[in-house]
Amino acid sequence: MAWTGPIKGTFSGMVPRCLRRTPEQTRDVIDSERLLYHRFRALFREGASQSPLETCCRNHKRSSARADQTNIRVKKTMVAKTRNPRAIHPLNEKVYSVRKIFKQLPSNKPSRIVPVRENGCRWRKVVYHRAHFEELPMSFKLSPRAYPRFNCLVRKHGYGKTIRMVSCYASGISEAKNSLARTIREKFARSAYLSGKRQVPPPLKREDFGTWNDYREELKKNQTKWYLCRVHYRQAYDRLYDQEFRYWKGHCSFETTRPRVRCGDWQSPLDSLVALQSPPMDLVCNAPTLLPTAIPVPDHPSYRKYKLSDLSWTKQHERAVREDQKRLKRAVGEKDKIKDKYGVQHERLYRQNFMKNFRRIAEMGRSSAPRGPFL
């Protein structure tokens, strides 16, 4: 296997620390570094020498990990001369005898890459032996998994969104159910749930609070407290469960963060309780007014071509749909015709370029799957 340059994908080692801007990215990096380092330590054979030169198998020598912790200069990995000259990897042009290895001059470059797969190497899991643990192969860092780990998702998207994304593995499902119940109980007053009676929040008295500011804060908090009686609690749970987790009933592919949009979908978009934007007001016992009759249109790409003032989500006639498509096509065509002052049709070129690339990638099939962290 030839050396094709450093492993593609996001770095998660120490290397481009400066590019990691936000604190959570930095935390992510530091975290994965810790993990990596311990993985790396585990790769050493028991009782392997910690001298600057180590042997991993009969004909390989490599610098030890100790070298990049102190400022010792790292030596190149060297291949000892064997009786079988074909066993030497072609990338190592120089061939060393074991005796001469120790006369090597030290250098600042990282160790040479020696791919050893089935060569009887005792470090089974290592594809490339090198002295720098940040550059271990992908499989030790963010290996593409069938499903990303739950805590990775939580770190990336936050708990609420993750719960909504996690649709395909059982632990996620029970997690989601529990968190949904917990969220409803925390956000809606618990006493109301237990009492089964309609609740009215008691009016606050000014004299119970030291400063005006405390009083105002408390008033604000009180506005966001919604009471559900037992029946409505049940209903809210069912409704949220159906809406957020519909795709457990089979409308799901793992990547979708929401159910697929169908004709009747999102007629009354209820913000999920998990990301608590608004309560299901028609169920809230102490809601001052009912919902306004006009339902806001979700801002979703599949709806953008319709007039936002049109609130009837009835299925359009075939003819209307065809007209719509024609109009869109015409618009795109017009855009394609625009030339700059040198007569170049940029939009057209972009389009062609994009399609060409798209086709190329499609033809390669899964062999060129992106190796990103969560794919």
UniProtKB/Swiss-Prot annotation:
<protein>
    <recommendedName>
        <fullName>Non-structural protein NS5</fullName>
    </recommendedName>
</protein>
